[in-house]
């Protein structure tokens, strides 16, 4: 039997598994079955906690989408990860250093129950996003058979394309998201953000995630939207980001600096399952 915990960050939900005290392995087929909301546990992503690969770090963790694919980064998952390792007694620290397949980051448990995550320095160089473009630009033209889109592009360890929309509530997120997430100019696929700027310190955002469709919240998507908005001269250093599942606060001092994301992480229940 495998012990697991169900958690969510603003409705972006996770199955979190302790791979430090348990010997666990998940095949893509098992992950897809567990992710099924009718026949399994149901989640957007599975988070697997592992011992650190580096003695200077506290943990390593792996992130799997509901379709079984492994991904590089997840902001909402990082907050749940921090709350999980503390709740399970795997650490007694309030400041936790971890690695994922995309790099290292620092997580800080706040007194009010929220978690602040150092999301790292955003990647704007197209070849590293990866995105097919000759040089970094504030905006890019993305052409499809149906229409042309104006977008910003950045990576937070995973690739993001951000579109500016007048009304996020009526945006065709499912249709446009499905169209752009596999666009040929993003060789590894892309998460697609739909950003409505309310004012320079406040945006509304919906995100169509690569491998998971639209989710209630996307932490890396919120960071990417703030980066793109700042670069385009629309946003301040600290921005409130309203997502369908709730609110995040993103702080970015500008190019070459890391982003800091603060938001909630909720425990739902503990369970055990036979694979």
Curated annotation (Swiss-Prot):
Gene Ontology terms, MF aspect: diaminopimelate epimerase activity
Gene3D superfamilies linked: Diaminopimelate Epimerase, Chain A, domain 1
Site label Important for dimerization, positions: 269
Name of the top EC class for this enzyme: isomerase
GO cellular component: cytosol
Database matches in SUPFAM superfamilies: Diaminopimelate epimerase-like
Domain of life (superkingdom): Bacteria
EC number: 5.1.1.7
Pathway: Amino-acid biosynthesis; L-lysine biosynthesis via DAP pathway; DL-2,6-diaminopimelate from LL-2,6-diaminopimelate: step 1/1
Residues bound to substrate: 12, 45, 65, 75-76, 158, 191, 209-210, 219-220
Active-site residues per Swiss-Prot or TrEMBL entry: 74, 218
Keyword Chaperone part of the UniProt annotation: no
Site (Could be important to modulate the pK values of the two catalytic cysteine residues): 160, 209
Catalysed transformations (reactions): (2S,6S)-2,6-diaminopimelate = meso-2,6-diaminopimelate
Keyword check for Amino-acid biosynthesis: yes
Keyword line: Amino-acid biosynthesis, Cytoplasm, Isomerase, Lysine biosynthesis
Family to which the UniProt record says this protein belongs: Belongs to the diaminopimelate epimerase family.
Protein name: Diaminopimelate epimerase
Gene: dapF
């Amino acid at each position: 039997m495998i012990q697991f915990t169900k958690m969510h960050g603003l409705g972006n939900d996770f199955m979190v598994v302790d791979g430090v005290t348990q010997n666990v392995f998940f095949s893509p087929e098992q992950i897809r079955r567990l992710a099924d909301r009718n026949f399994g546990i149901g989640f957007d992503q599975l988070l697997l906690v592992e011992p650190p690969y580096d003695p200077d770090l506290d943990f390593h963790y792996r992130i799997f989408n509901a379709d079984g694919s492994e991904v590089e980064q997840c902001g909402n998952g990082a907050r749940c990860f921090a709350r999980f390792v503390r709740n399970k007694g795997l650490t007694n620290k309030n400041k936790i250093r971890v690695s994922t397949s995309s790099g290292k980051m620092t997580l800080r448990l706040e007194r009010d129950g929220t978690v602040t995550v150092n999301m790292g320095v955003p990647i704007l160089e197209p070849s590293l996003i990866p995105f097919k473009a000759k040089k970094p630009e504030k905006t890019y033209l993305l052409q499809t058979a149906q229409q042309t889109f104006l977008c910003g592009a950045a990576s937070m360890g995973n690739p993001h394309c951000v579109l500016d929309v007048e009304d996020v509530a009526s945006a065709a997120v499912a249709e446009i998201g499905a169209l752009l997430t596999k666009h040929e100019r993003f060789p590894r696929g892309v998460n697609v953000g739909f950003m409505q700027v309310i004012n320079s310190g406040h945006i509304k955002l919906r995100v169509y995630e690569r491998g998971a469709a639209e989710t209630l919240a996307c932490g890396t998507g919120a960071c990417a939207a703030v980066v793109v908005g700042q670069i385009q001269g629309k946003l301040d250093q600290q921005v409130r980001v309203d997502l369908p599942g709730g609110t995040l606060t993103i702080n970015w001092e500008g190019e070459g600096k890391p982003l800091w994301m603060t938001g909630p992480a909720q425990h739902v229940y503990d369970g055990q399952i036979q694979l």
